Regions:
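Hydrophobic, Leu/Ile/Phe/Ala-enriched alpha-helical segments that form helix-helix packing faces
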Residues: 13, 48-59, 117-125
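N-terminal leader/targeting segments
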Residues: 22-94
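Long, charged/polar, surface-exposed segments that mediate recognition or autoinhibition
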Residues: 83-141
């Protein structure tokens, strides 16, 4: 009988501890504009890899092209009972001279998230192919060091209309 109570205590402690560790996060953390511009300055996939994993992203695929390599990371999230996959692509030139960060999601309104952070940037005319699409609304910004494209694309989903948000950050 002496061993019964401590055994029950430890079993309950183990069950409650594991329950607390498995709760699903209700927040979906995205990097700030300052963080995105810092990453674009890295020109190093290794440094980027360490920091993006801290936000819950996992490496998915590496794609080599003629002048650059793209590293794609994904994060699966559930918000209000709906499953989403966030994607971030780190593209770096083969000579490590430039890099571009591209983030695509439907889980969070990136326009609302990033617009207040872009007050120090100049709003410029968008010349990107995405901005010319009639279903896409884009705002383009520039500072002395970076160019940022922020888009809200109306897409037809199988269960109705939805938004797909896109932000791209490049060092000038």
């Amino acid at each position: 009988m002496k061993a019964f109570y401590p055994t029950i205590y430890f079993v309950l402690l183990a069950i409650l501890s594991s329950y607390g560790q498995n709760t699903t996060s209700k927040t979906n953390t995205f990097p700030t504009v300052a963080t995105l511009t810092n990453w674009a300055n890295y020109n190093s996939q290794q440094k980027f890899d360490l920091e993006i994993r801290a936000l819950g992203f996992k490496f998915e695929v590496k794609e080599a092209e003629t002048s650059s390599i793209a590293y794609t990371y994904i994060r699966k999230v559930m918000i209000d009972g709906v499953n989403y996959t966030d994607r971030i692509v780190y593209r770096i030139t083969n000579d490590n001279s430039a890099s571009i960060i591209t983030l695509v999601t439907a889980s969070t309104d990136l326009v609302t998230l990033y617009n207040p952070q872009l007050t120090a940037f100049n709003n410029v005319k968008c010349e990107t192919p995405m901005a010319k699409d009639k279903n896409t609304s884009c705002n383009c910004y520039e500072s002395k060091t970076h160019a940022i494209d922020l888009c809200d694309e109306r897409v037809k989903l199988t269960m109705g209309d939805g938004n797909k948000y896109f932000v791209s950050v490049a060092k000038i």
